[in-house]
Amino acid sequence: MTPAWAQRQEDLLSDCVVSPDVFHHMVDHLRDFVVPYQHALETEAGQRNVHLYLAGLLSHLDRKNAEQIAALVDVERLVLQEFIGTAPWDHRPLVRVLVGEVVARLGEPDGIIAFDPSSFPKRGTHSVGVKRQWCGHRGKVDNCQVGVYMGYVARSDHALLDFRLSLPEDWARDAHRRQACHVPEDVQYHTRQEQCLEMLDLWGEQVPHGWVTGDDELGRHTQFRQQLRARGERYVLGVPCTTAIRDLEAPWPGYQGRGRPPKPPWQSVTAWRQTLDPDVWTRLTVRDGEKGPIEIAMIKRRVQTRLERKRTGPQEWLVVTRRPLADASALEEHASLDAAEQDAQYRYRYYLTPTCGAEGKLEQPSLAELARVIKAGGCIEASFQRGKSEAGMDEYQVRTWEGWHHHMALTLIAVWFLVSETHRGQQRTPALTLPQVRYGLSMLLLEVFCTLSIASICRHVQRRLMRNELARFYHHRARKCMPQRKLRRDIQ
């Protein structure tokens, strides 16, 4: 090992030295962090329960639902289940506090608002909004709920801000299912694009941003792009590989003097991309990944798009990204393959962004800036991963409308606390990561809640026994058969 590599190894390891100040008073920080959210609730019981539930979401529990959290923090199971599942408190004031805190810490003029759906697989048919639909979590059509999320991506970090439950159209028309799951009367069916626009209209002025981004589920709808342009928003939206475009920078066919002058033909973005010369791609380094720099190749071209019913649409920039499916050394081994086989060694993504700004002037965003916006989509996926792996985002056991929204709001708040503590800890330990902050905090909470006395152990066991016996009782009652009491055993 050369001296330079040895020095860098030493530097990296020194960045991992954890000062006691990183975790000192972290439990107190959580208590102080919760105060603004407690003030958003009206009852003392709600203020107490929000702190306990957040502590449970940040704990060591394998399944972070109301029952498991209640056992950890030593409160009655029904108390937390009612608080999350059916209590009539409004989650929106808590979201308002969250948005304010995220903007205060991360806000920047050219920040990025990112929209993305996330699915939650379910087995039954009684949870609000559940239906056989596309489940991105499993990569197929399956029984699931889908939430639409609004995130904020800055250069320093990212966070989820707001959300909407995607209520399918057949659910919106079913009065019996709506009543069973407590769906409010004023809630009607809205497309996911409409839900994104609703959140943008609600928070757009408060959240400083220069771009809006989303995947091809949103970008394929021309009306959604049109609505963003009408609001003066700059966007980078994914589109399917079948999207029809006309290359406005390609040579136009020669005019023969009769009829209308010919125009470049319509073709799919995939067919258009396959005609490109290999030299037109520009290589950029997006970020430094765990296994080295992550590079992509990009191209930008001014095109005309189509509206519904094959009507001619506006001019937009088509942006194509190319990333290898394997590392560079593996690609060199495929140099002898023909063009089609070499093309299969890459993953392509297609995006559209407006050519004109709010004042109608032609915009020329740089490839580096477009790459930054495209990368924001990956940041939102990372936010989902944080929520699901560190704060039990997908581990709820509720069926009602309010239960789903209560759990989601508290999950986003819990993750934001981890982000805040990670930023604080990185001042002393630069290599500190959010999962390690959650791990350290969970150990501290274990010490707080698990100093068990004989009396508390008896309460834990009693709750489990009562749960089991009540289940046995209701099963027997359904069959109109009186359950037998269990006999006390005499010690011989």
Model regions: which residues?
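Glycine-rich phosphate-binding "P-loop"
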Residues: 25, 176-195
